[in-house]
């Protein structure tokens, strides 16, 4: 019985349960049956004539015994049961008893004389019969030996590997694990299959293999061999066998090294640096085969010229309806076309050509069987319809053809040099696999014989033939070491992997130790099948192929030869087969190839074209041949083994990305239209439609997000696909159950509606909306009580109404974040910046800017004190929040008239000129468009002018006035919604919004998932960068909004003060909004303390206090648009930092010289190009790369902002020093209502604390907290005073490394 080469072995198994394994090991040996006396040897003369009669008698008896033994083994291997195992062992014992009786008789009669017989055939027969092997053992040990073989076979053949945490899904080696190793490209899935099989089979086999080794050696030593390995090598009748093999291996090694280097490079492209070291061994599970012995299953990854016709005809076989029987008929027809024998009827009647579907456990490893009755020959194979298996079919049928040809030889001569037996079928497979032959049998449409097609074909063959050579060589190197004792059981695994790394250049993909027995995971080890035969075969088959091609009259390269239908070649092959082992194999080989030695030259000739090609490729890539970093090992994948079922096929991922992109544009366009309709006409009907579209979006997000979650992108080489899929995997709110999602959407809509339609009414019945009424009053009124009424009324109307919704909103937002794998919603929001140190980086930036803010705060406080008096302003306390010209005290530019450093200098505000010149909102947008165009950037499209809402409607519609820019995802429809007022402040906002539109237009050709800013702050910064130029007196003069460019020192300080009231005043507010929200999300701020903690942060960072008592019934954060609209706010802090970095870099590009605050990049194409190049990246790269495009470095830094405001900082230091200002607010408990806050409120049992109406206990806790803050602020103030006066004499341009972000207008595109 010839086994198919190990290269065609099985896949993954689960170890037997401990109880089953124990039963296997403890199963009592079968009772010894008695051999039929008629089968025992009689009396023969002790001479050559007697030996001839002895041999004849032995032959007839042996046929009967071997038939029974083989039939029992067949029954067991095609139906593994305890009963069949028992019968197999019984027959093995009988066979061994027969061998013992005849062997001992042969030794007794002929040992003194047999080597002198004149008949060489007779010498060979007697020599074979007298070798008893296991029959030398005493009965008990013989029974133990047979049980070991049966149990090892059973462990291997019934093993399973089970999917983690799923007991129902278990894989057998064939076909399951073999298919996974061949077809999966998932690193983790391959690792799980590989590790599972090696653990499931190897570990339980180790103790059995130790026992087997001892018994086998004991048996063969009694036949005169030093160990079992010596007996196996004796079959090759060559005293220099080992030296010859080593010589041949070294002759072939350069070809293997070049193939290894080429394949390693391709795997590196697929799996990256993490898993492939270009100077190290290849992880053993990545080569398409459980044992990395043949690599043809990864041909699709390494094919040199992928545009050439595919030489793997598997798909064609399937399309044409080939089945297992047809594959064997095709193979039979090849043999008969050479004039060789057809398969007998018994072959077709009795063979197992497919894996049974009746639940039987079988030994799937392909094998050919001789039943020794000269008519029954079978193949056992779990055949699958693949090209690889078509070669296996020819290989196995080669064994059967050998059986048929030598069946009339004596039993002892019905064999051959094992390498011959393995080579015959493969010789034919060399013809079958040629494109010419595949065309003949209808599996290739046409044959292309150009160089590129030849290289493709030869590389495919090399993946099978050359890749196998070191494995074919090392398996028995290891086994011979085990048999000889050089490798003790304590070093089984170490030596196994030493050899595999030394010869194959592979390494285990996971830690292995001596608990493991990885050699046992290879069929031929537990089945005790010698393996060096395959190495010999792989050399011999090319010698045979060359000889047969010459006989067939082939002309041309050896790799193109097809001996199909050559009866001359068949006749030459027949002579080899019929000889069996009746003659020395060297003689048979000489008759065949005209040489009596193994020779690798025909193999080298066959692969010469691809050898040269590989050398050229490797030289071009600077490959290191070999693996000098031989001790390198790959790390384990993240989320292993739980994530093993994820898809890692990049082609499938690309198809997903294309489909997602197509569907996204349609669905989101509809949603954007519905959202626009609602925002520009708030009605019940519009809200219903919007909610429907919201659910449609959620369904789309859920569908495609779950699809995306099937992919493991960790090893994707396509960075774009990887980035898109990772983004789509976040299901956002769509992850919520449907009912909860509907409730969540309704909460968000209700909160935004409350905010957008709110108005406050005077006593006289007149009502005012936020835009423009309340906003204008906050900006222009200087009446303390009027401002107080506006401030308080807005919060009473909006904040209090939103509070009931907010806790549930927090609950749903957190739940969605956690279901998406985040700690909480704050963690989710921060993840958009892809910066693990984001919070620390932001804090560092804030600390860098704090001195500038504290000086501005002190100066503005002094100016307000002059206007409102000591009754309302405490020079050592916080500033009342309603006096700073803005509803949220986030920007202070509207009180510039109160704080102008040099009031007599000409005004910096262009509002008056805009009104006088008849500017309209459209004119403001047209002016912004001109600015972008002057930089070489894109004009807004016609749809923008036709569809935008640039003014608040006068037809009575309720609208969301908050300015926002919109992308409708069709590449041409971009809009702005803004209740624009003709003033200087809104001119800046217009440029900000047009910056969003420009960003949309620049990245419109990217996949939709990447149509975002590099980070949220980038999107906010772009328009503000241009506004820094637009705001300069130089630019305002150029567009006729200022009478002069200014230019004097006083003008500069006035201008910088006005800019600081916008930019510097905003810094702490933009920092604290999400500080508060993140703490709400993480639970450190509870709903009972929403308002208290809000004002604690506003005091801490802004130095502000509420102008009226606040209670926990108030919800002042809710009076800020971004809170009820659930728009993250830290983007604006980031934007305000990076816009100055951008401005500084663009000014350099524009060739600006002089102070940074005087720069105007108008009409600079070079500045525009830098900006466009960064915007075109969208979200396709991490934000530091986009930062580098503009600034030449990847970090966020406050140095540009400090540089911009340095003249003002110097002036403020002088001015505050002159007045003896105390920086900060050491009297932090002061409020405008301090007189009332000293005692309890009348009849309430409550007290005023920090302007909030609290119970006594809450106030006491607050006092302790503020005491601590006061001490901290006092110390900080002392430190800052020293630091600030030193700053005057130092450059404020300090290097900084950190993140970036952008401005106070909502971005609606996502």
From Swiss-Prot:
Lineage of the organism: Eukaryota, Metazoa, Chordata, Craniata, Vertebrata
Listed transmembrane segments: 1261-1281
Reported regulation of activity: The dipeptidyl carboxypeptidase activity is strongly activated by chloride. Specifically inhibited by lisinopril. Inhibited by mixanpril, an orally-active drug used for the treatment of hypertension.
Function noted in UniProt: Dipeptidyl carboxypeptidase that removes dipeptides from the C-terminus of a variety of circulating hormones, such as angiotensin I, bradykinin or enkephalins, thereby playing a key role in the regulation of blood pressure, electrolyte homeostasis or synaptic plasticity. Composed of two similar catalytic domains, each possessing a functional active site, with different selectivity for substrates.
Binding residue positions for chloride 1: 236, 533
Swiss-Prot/TrEMBL catalytic activity: Release of a C-terminal dipeptide, oligopeptide-|-Xaa-Yaa, when Xaa is not Pro, and Yaa is neither Asp nor Glu. Thus, conversion of angiotensin I to angiotensin II, with increase in vasoconstrictor activity, but no action on angiotensin II; angiotensin I + H2O = L-histidyl-L-leucine + angiotensin II; bradykinin + H2O = L-Phe-L-Arg + bradykinin(1-7); substance P + H2O = substance P(1-9) + L-Leu-L-Met-NH2
Known EC number: 3.4.15.1
Cytoplasmic side: 1282-1310
Cofactor: Zn(2+); chloride
Residue sites binding chloride 3 per the record: 833, 1131
Name by which UniProt lists this protein: Angiotensin-converting enzyme
Binding site for Zn(2+) 1: 395, 399, 422
Cleavable signal peptide: 1-33
Post-translational modification comment from the UniProt entry: N-glycosylated. Phosphorylated by CK2 on Ser-1303; which allows membrane retention. Phosphorylated on tyrosine residues on its extracellular part, promoting cleavage by secretase enzymes and formation of the soluble form (Angiotensin-converting enzyme, soluble form).
GO MF terms, alphabetically ordered: calmodulin binding; carboxypeptidase activity; chloride ion binding; metal ion binding; metallodipeptidase activity; metalloendopeptidase activity; peptidase activity; peptidyl-dipeptidase activity
Residues reported in the UniProt entry to bind Zn(2+) 2: 992, 996, 1020
Subunit comment: Monomer and homodimer; homodimerizes following binding to an inhibitor. Interacts with calmodulin (CALM1, CALM2 or CALM3); interaction takes place in the cytoplasmic region and regulates phosphorylation and proteolytic cleavage.
Outcome reported for the amino acid change (mutating residue 1303 to D): Mimics phosphorylation; does not affect calmodulin-binding
Family: Belongs to the peptidase M2 family.
Keywords associated with the record: Calmodulin-binding, Carboxypeptidase, Cell membrane, Cytoplasm, Disulfide bond, Glycoprotein, Hydrolase, Membrane, Metal-binding, Metalloprotease, Phosphoprotein, Protease, Repeat, Secreted, Signal, Transmembrane, Transmembrane helix, Zinc
Chain intervals for the UniProt region annotation (Juxtamembrane stalk): 1219-1260
Chain positions found as Phosphoserine: 1303
ATP-binding in keyword set: no
Organism field: Oryctolagus cuniculus
